[in-house]
């Protein structure tokens, strides 16, 4: 992808996409990130259609060579392109089978406790000793 984009040197550490190649670079970057995005419902891209339609594709893209990181100067795109490394811990994926299994286990446990043979503590056995 980045082979077709022309770069220009900013400093000894940073290079920038040339102004005439920025639109192509942005489209390729957004397409690659969208393609690599997980398809489960626990992931939020924060990318909306209006962001793509009204986006200024001449915004610079800077690459830091030493740290090997892409510097995006647009805040909305930076938030959308920074994907989480792992899933959210607060998200619980429970399907109908899990809920049904939990209900059956709760009913069985209730029946087991209600009808289990417990020793009768009201009956006192008296032992008599004869000498």
Curated annotation (Swiss-Prot):
The protein's name in its UniProt record: Uncharacterized 15.4 kDa protein
Domain of life: Viruses
């Amino acid at each position: 992808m980045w082979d077709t984009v022309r770069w220009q040197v900013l400093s000894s550490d940073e290079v920038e996409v040339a102004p005439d190649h920025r639109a192509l670079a942005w489209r390729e970057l957004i397409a690659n990130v969208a393609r690599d995005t997980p398809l489960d419902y626990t992931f939020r891209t924060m990318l909306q259609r209006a962001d793509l339609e009204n986006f200024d594709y001449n915004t610079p893209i800077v690459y830091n060579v030493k740290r090997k990181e892409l510097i995006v100067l647009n805040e909305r795109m930076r938030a959308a392109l920074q994907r989480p490394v792992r899933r959210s811990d607060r998200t619980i994926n429970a399907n109908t089978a899990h809920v049904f299994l939990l209900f059956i286990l709760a009913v069985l446990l209730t029946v087991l406790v209600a009808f289990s043979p417990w020793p009768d503590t009201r009956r006192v056995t008296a032992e008599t000793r004869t000498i």
